[in-house]
A protein has these predicted regions:
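Broad phosphate/nucleotide-binding scaffolds in NTP-utilizing and phosphate-metabolizing enzymes
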Residues: 1-206
């Protein structure tokens, strides 16, 4: 319900900013996009370069929107501990110490930590509630498609294939796919001293 309310706020803010171009409205819009979850943030990341090519967007606004790439909201350490326990059937602290957040992206966040021998390790965890957020996003798209004037306007001004986006998003939310890509590149560049692919230790979907 909270997520749906955030989408409703965005639907009000978008046309309001379009007709006024007030900087404050843009900042509030950006804040609400960050609160709306992984799907909409990734959708913005995915669509902004395409729209920029089509419409030559204001570069100052593009720079602000770059916050959506590297400065997304962090989820809690408690959630990370829970997901690690669920997937590997042991506490994260059994093997690792000095766990600290490095960065948070649209789909997951990365930690730096050390194993018991002191070797540095990176850990990536998918953000919570992504399945729910995806269903909400698809429901909003369904409702938009029911209103012909809105649907036609979006297709005219925003000619982007949403099916491709949703397939790409689903692929990225499964870390096993990322692990397979890691192994593929490690094999491809195993004899190249200038390209170092991180060694994969263990993996789960989340």
């Amino acid at each position: 319900m909270i997520l749906l309310f955030t989408y409703i706020k965005l639907m009000v803010l978008l046309p309001l900013y379009y007709f006024t171009e007030y900087e404050m409205i843009f900042d509030v819009l950006l804040l609400n996009i960050k609160k709306s979850g992984s799907v909409l943030i990734k959708f913005c990341q995915w669509s902004i370069p395409r729209l920029n090519e089509m419409y030559n967007l204001d570069q100052k606004k593009i720079q602000k929107l770059e916050e959506l790439y590297e400065r997304c909201n962090f989820h809690s350490m408690e959630y990370t501990e829970k997901i690690y326990q669920k997937n590997f059937h042991e506490s994260i602290y059994k093997k690792y110490d000095s766990i600290e957040e490095i960065a948070s992206g649209s789909i997951g966040q990365v930690y730096r930590m050390k194993d018991k021998e002191g070797e540095a390790i990176a850990l990536k965890i998918i953000h919570p509630n992504i399945d729910c957020e995806l269903r909400t996003f698809q429901y909003i798209l369904y409702l938009i498609n029911l209103v012909k004037p809105i649907r036609d306007s979006i297709k005219y001004y925003f000619p982007i294939n949403l099916t491709v986006f949703l397939e790409d998003f689903n692929s990225q939310t499964n870390l096993i796919n990322e692990a397979n890509n890691n192994l593929l590149f490690a094999s491809m560049y195993r004899n190249n001293e200038y390209i170092i692919i991180p060694e994969l230790i263990t993996v789960s979907k989340q």
